[in-house]
Each structure stands twice: as structure tokens, then as C-alpha cells.
Amino acid sequence: QTLKEHPEMSSMKETAERFFDVCDTGKGWDACQQFCHADASFSAQAGALADVNTLQEYADWMKGLLTPVPDGQCEVRSFAVDEDRNNVTAYAVFRGTHTGEGGPVPPTGKQIEADYVYVMQFEGPKISHLTKIWNDGISLQQLGWA
């Protein structure tokens, strides 16, 4: 099966890629909302994100992360469409250095290199839920925040 035979796969992948690009470069909900349902939910088994329940909150959390880590960048390692389950999975690595103000402690100069995965669930052409799989404890230790 090819993307030409299944245009919905291409559309889902394109939407997910465009969402990922604006979300993980810190553009916030204003840039992300066009790819998501207004009430899109969010979940993660990570203490740092315990109070984040909507995709709007998460997009703005990512925007806020780039204040203390202004050089933060993501390297996508894998992007996969699961047509049967109506979702797209992205595996990436986030790298950056805590040089900016606004973190839980003054700038540490320490670097983060964090693996993480998004599973973006679709309803129709837009994202309805995002699950983030991430070991926040290691990331917080790397930055000197824990």
C-alpha cells in the first residue's frame, strides 16, 4: 500500500509533521491549534507534566521550555503512520543547554539530550490527543534541575 493509494495517510502524516515542527520549535498553541481539535487532550507519565492535560497547555509548555533552554532543538529519528489505529508516532531527541533565565534554578550551563516519543491520535483530519513518552527524571538531572 502506498500513500497514493491512501491519501488519508499522506494527510495525517503531513498534519503530524507540521504540528511537530511548530510545537517542538516553541511556537505555542497559536501556531499549533490549526492542526488540532480545540479540545485536544494530552497525557504523559512524567511528573514534570503532571498538571498538563490539554494539547493547548502542552504546546505552551514547550514554548516556555525554550526560555531557559533557548538553543533547544529536536532531531526527528522516526516518523510512522498507523492507518489502522488512526495515529502517527514520532521519535525524536531534544538537545539544548540551560543558559536562559526562567527555569526552576538560575542557569546551570548544563546540557540535555532527551529521547521522547509522541503518539498523535487523529479524529478526522486533526489531532484529538497526544501522548508523550519521556523520562523526565533523567532530563531534569541532566539540566541540574533535580
Which residues make up each language-model segment?
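C-terminal and inter-domain tail/linker signature
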Residues: T2-A146
